[in-house]
Swiss-Prot record:
Short name of any one Pfam family annotated for the protein: Ost4
Single GO BP term: protein N-linked glycosylation via asparagine
Main location: endoplasmic reticulum
Membrane topology annotation: Single-pass type III membrane protein
Transmembrane segments: 5-25
Name of the featured protein: Dolichyl-diphosphooligosaccharide--protein glycosyltransferase subunit 4
Length: 40
């Protein structure tokens, strides 16, 4: 059976992983695709 401490650790690790996944998705999405024209 899963104890309260194990459940808390699992949920915290899962939350951090999902948060970092969202941050990485936004970072990759914002920095790819549209090339920025260079100012002369």
């Amino acid at each position: 059976m899963i104890t309260d401490v194990q459940l808390a650790i699992f949920s915290n690790v899962l939350g951090v992983f999902l948060f970092l996944l969202v941050v990485a998705y936004h970072y990759i999405n914002a920095n790819t695709g549209k090339p920025i024209p260079k100012a002369k």
